[in-house]
Design a protein with these regions (language model features):
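Acidic, His/Gly-rich catalytic cores of divalent-metal-dependent hydrolytic chemistry
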Residues: 189-310
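Active-site environment of divalent metal-dependent phosphoester hydrolases
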Residues: 53-55, 96-98, 128-136, 166-169, ...
Length: 310
C-alpha cells in the first residue's frame, strides 16, 4: 500500500482489517512512549472484541454452550495466512472475564499467544475486560506480547484504543483512530417485514472537539460544550450520560482532520449495539459526538450510508 492511501483495509467478509501504520501526509511522528514503535510501514492484522472464554461466562449464567476457543483461534490464523501481516493488534477485550480470568479462559489465552508468537508479534490494547492481561502474559512467560495501557497506543500514523474510556491525547491526534467496544450492528428490515441484524464497520471524519474540550477542562468531570457529563469517579464507560444527537448546531466548526473507525466484534456470540435504532445508545463516552457524519459498511463492503438512516 502506498503512503497516502487508505491505511485501513477491511478483510472481505471478516470482522478484521489490515492496518498500515506508516506516517502519512508528511507526518513523521511515531509514539514510542506508550508501547509504540518506529517500524514505519508495518502491516498489522487488527481485530476487536475477541472475548476469549465467553462460553465460560455464559455457562455461569445457565446457558449451555460448547467452547469455541479452537474455532476462534483457527479463524485468526486463517486471516494471518490470507493477509501475511507482521503483527496482530487486539483492539481491546481480548479476554471476556472482567478481572482475573479463570483457568479455562487463561488456557485459551495462553495457547493463542503461544501459536501467534511463533508467527508474529502481538499487541493487546487493554479494554474493560482485560484487567488481568499482564498477569496472564507474565505467568505464561511468552515474549513478543505487549500489553498497552487502557488509554491506548499510537503506532506510527494510527491510534488504537478500545473505546470504553477516553484515549490519550496523542492517540486521538493520529490521522486515523481505531476503536472497538461497541460491537456495532444494524437492524435491517426487508420488504415483507422480516428483520435481521448484521455486524458493521462504522467509519467517518473524526470530530476532535470532545477531546479538545476534555483536555481544556478544569478536570471537574464536566465537558459542557459537547453535552457530555462524566460522573465523578468513573473512567467514562456505560454510565456516562450524553446528548446523543451528534448535532453540530450552535457549536464551533468541527475539527475533522482525521478518521475514526469503529471495528465490528470478532466474536460473533457477543451481540452488539444496533446503531440505527435510536433507543439503543452508544457505550463509548465519546460516541456519537466524535462521529457525527459516520457511515455504516457491511462486512462484504456494501456501503449503507449514514448509519442513523439505514
Amino acid at each position: 500500500m502506498a503512503a497516502g492511501s487508505d491505511p485501513i483495509e477491511p478483510v472481505p467478509e471478516a470482522p478484521a482489517a489490515v492496518v498500515d501504520t506508516r506516517p502519512r501526509n508528511g507526518d513523521p511522528r511515531c509514539d514510542e512512549s506508550r508501547g509504540g514503535d518506529s517500524r514505519h510501514g508495518e502491516r498489522a492484522l487488527v481485530v476487536a472484541d475477541y472475548h476469549a472464554g465467553l462460553e465460560v461466562g455464559l455457562r455461569r449464567e445457565g446457558v449451555s454452550v460448547p467452547s469455541h476457543a479452537a474455532d476462534r483461534r483457527e479463524r485468526l490464523h486463517a486471516l494471518l495466512d490470507e493477509t501475511r501481516t507482521e503483527r496482530v493488534v487486539f483492539l481491546g477485550d481480548l479476554a471476556h472475564a472482567i478481572g482475573d480470568p479463570g483457568e479455562e479462559e487463561r488456557k485459551e489465552l495462553e495457547i493463542l499467544f503461544e501459536t501467534l508468537t511463533e508467527r508474529v508479534s502481538v499487541v493487546v490494547v487493554k479494554g474493560n475486560h482485560d484487567g488481568g492481561m499482564e498477569e496472564v502474559v507474565e505467568r505464561a512467560g511468552i515474549e513478543d506480547v505487549r500489553v498497552t495501557p487502557t488509554e491506548g497506543v499510537r503506532l506510527g500514523a494510527v491510534g488504537f484504543a478500545h473505546g470504553h474510556t477516553w484515549p490519550a491525547s496523542d492517540v486521538v491526534e493520529a490521522p486515523t483512530v481505531c476503536i472497538g467496544h461497541e460491537h456495532p450492528t444494524v437492524r435491517l428490515t426487508d420488504s415483507v417485514g422480516g428483520q435481521r441484524v448484521e455486524p458493521i464497520w462504522l467509519r467517518g471524519p473524526l470530530d476532535r472537539r470532545p477531546f479538545d474540550a476534555r483536555s481544556d477542562s478544569d478536570d471537574d468531570g464536566v465537558d459542557a460544550e459537547v453535552g457530555i457529563t462524566e460522573p465523578s469517579g468513573t473512567e467514562g464507560g456505560d454510565d456516562v450520560e450524553r446528548d446523543g444527537t451528534g448535532s453540530n448546531s450552535g457549536r464551533e466548526p468541527a475539527r475533522t482532520d482525521g478518521e475514526l473507525v469503529v471495528f465490528p466484534a470478532f466474536n460473533d456470540l457477543v451481540g452488539g449495539t444496533w446503531v440505527n435504532v435510536p433507543e439503543q445508545g452508544f457505550l463509548s463516552p465519546f460516541l456519537p459526538e466524535t462521529l457525527s457524519d459516520g457511515e455504516a459498511y457491511l462486512l462484504d463492503g456494501t456501503r449503507l450510508g449514514d448509519y442513523r438512516r439505514v
